[in-house]
């Protein structure tokens, strides 16, 4: 990897952390440049614009292509994702990106559209017993508990041990995926 490729990769890495943790509109090009320890002009040179850089960070996530999700393991897969990110530090996960950017005035619609096209629709195609409503209820619980723990920092949730948190997640997700309308 030559110097310009390394610089471009460093910009992408730092932009992803900032965009996904703080939201697109809350992050400036100067802030990205400062964090990446590069001149701000290099962002325009390599990515043309802040928006293109953001789109590149989203494109760097593989969405559902690597996820073996089916009716029998969906609860375990989603529980595992939240258990992997139990610490309270900033994180670069797709959950955090969705939470921080789906209501953004500039990129919100883009993020929602990508989530539907690259996450929801492909996963629903893999499910036979879990209905679209049940899946959406589970996602609501998934994002809700993540927000409540990480953003609102509710003491009873932030102090949970991994085994307790896992039990709660499975209980909530089972309730969502077995809901009868």
Across the structure, where does each feature detected by a protein language model lie?
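Basic, helix-initiating cap at the start of DNA-binding domains
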Residues: 1-22, 26-37, 51-52
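Key DNA-contact positions within bacterial/archaeal DNA-binding proteins
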Residues: 41
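Alpha-helical DNA-contacting segments of helix-turn-helix folds
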Residues: 45, 56-61
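Short, solvent-exposed alpha-helical "recognition" segments
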Residues: 50-55, 63
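Hydrophobic alpha-helical connector segments
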Residues: 63-95
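Short alpha-helical scaffolding segments that buttress acidic/His motifs in well-ordered protein cores
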Residues: 82, 94-102, 138-146
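Amphipathic alpha-helical segments used for helix-helix packing
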Residues: 86-115
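Hydrophobic/aromatic-rich alpha-helical bundle segments in the mid-to-C-terminal region
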Residues: 108-116, 124-181
């Amino acid at each position: 990897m030559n110097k310009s490729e390394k610089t471009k990769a460093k910009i992408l890495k730092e932009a992803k952390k900032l965009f996904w943790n703080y939201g697109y509109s809350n992050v400036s090009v100067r802030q990205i440049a400062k964090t990446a320890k590069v001149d701000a002009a290099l962002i325009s040179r390599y990515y043309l614009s802040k928006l293109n850089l953001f789109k590149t960070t989203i494109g760097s996530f593989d969405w559902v292509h690597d996820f073996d999700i089916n009716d029998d393991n969906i609860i375990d897969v989603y529980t595992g994702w939240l258990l992997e990110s139990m610490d309270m530090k900033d994180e670069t996960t797709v959950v955090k990106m969705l939470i921080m950017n789906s209501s953004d005035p500039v990129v919100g619609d883009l993020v929602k559209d990508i989530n539907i096209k690259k996450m929801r629709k492909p996963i629903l195609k893999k499910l036979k017993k879990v209905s679209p409503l049940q899946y959406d209820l589970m996602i609501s619980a998934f994002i809700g508990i993540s927000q409540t723990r990480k953003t609102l920092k509710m003491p009873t949730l932030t102090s949970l041990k991994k085994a307790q948190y896992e039990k709660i997640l499975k209980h909530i997700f089972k309730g969502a995926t077995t809901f009868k309308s």
